[in-house]
Design a protein with these regions (language model features):
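Positively charged n-region of N-terminal signal peptides that target proteins for export
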Residues: 1-4
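Bacterial N-terminal signal peptides
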Residues: 6-17
Length: 263
């Protein structure tokens, strides 16, 4: 994460602290020690948190989206063939835009904002246009194909543990952050548009990794994909995505790390 986006992290934490189950979810979880409070049941009117959350909505989120306009959003436009030019930045920069979208979704949940909602809708449409037919979404490779520079590696997924270039590709890292953002958006708006894009990518990952002879057994370079899968399970009461954690030692550790991070 680059310095320009770091300021967003703290601002995203406050709305996320009231992280909660979605419209069709059960409250509580057998493997999570804290029962989350649904967003719709949280209303702040104090003199400490509410002003800060208001600043998050009016200043921090717009500032972060403006920062993402420098390279991150243009990369998605190029992947969608809506803008000319090559990829800029690092491949994991895709995740920064997902993180900002996640924080914006929490902001919407705490303070409805028609303009912000419209901005998110436009970005979600862009994500859908950039996404490959099979669900793959990693702008560096989509723009440059197998000639993607740097840590991307020569083919999909192969460089997840940095075996080719020495630096992991962050394909699964980006995907994990997309899933988290999509779940947050669904919780805040009851709109499945972003969730459906994430489902398409997650289905591809679930199909790609596993115990089968044609499936990959490469452990991820970061626990974020496990965290995304666990967030899906926690928020939507669905075990649809565990990403082969019970088959691959690295993924099982990834899931356990994700549980610790969430707690």
């Amino acid at each position: 994460m680059t310095k320009g986006i770091i300021l967003f992290v703290g601002a995203a934490v406050l709305p996320a602290a009231v992280y909660a189950a979605g419209p069709d979810a059960q409250t509580g979880s057998r493997d999570y020690p804290v029962n989350p409070v649904p967003m719709s049941q949280v209303h702040l009117n104090d003199v400490f948190w509410k002003p800060r959350i208001d600043i998050n909505s009016s200043v921090t989120v717009p500032s972060c989206f403006k920062k993402c306009e420098e390279t991150r959003i243009p990369n998605f436009r190029r992947a969608a063939k809506l803008q000319d030019g090559g990829f800029q930045g690092d491949p994991f920069d895709d995740s920064d835009l997902y993180k900002v979208c996640e924080g914006a979704a929490y902001s919407l949940a705490s303070k409805p904002d028609a303009a912000l909602n419209k901005q998110l809708d436009a970005l979600i449409v862009l994500f859908g246009k950039a996404q490959q037919p099979d669900g793959y979404l990693y702008t560096s490779r989509i723009i440059h194909g197998d000639k993607a520079p740097g840590r991307a590696g020569p083919v999909r997924w192969l460089n997840e543990m940095g075996g080719v270039t020495g630096d992991d590709s962050h394909e699964l890292y980006n995907a994990g952050h997309m899933i988290e953002a999509a779940v947050a958006h669904y919780q805040a708006t009851d709109n499945r548009a972003f969730l459906d894009i994430a489902v398409k990518l997650a289905d591809l990952i679930q199909k790609t990794w596993g115990p089968g002879p044609e499936q990959l057994k490469i452990s991820p370079g970061h626990q974020e994909i496990g965290l995304g899968g666990y967030r899906w399970h926690q928020a939507l009461s669905s075990r649809r995505y565990r990403f082969g954690c019970w088959h691959i030692g690295g993924f099982w550790q990834c899931l356990r790390d994700a549980q610790q991070w969430l707690q």
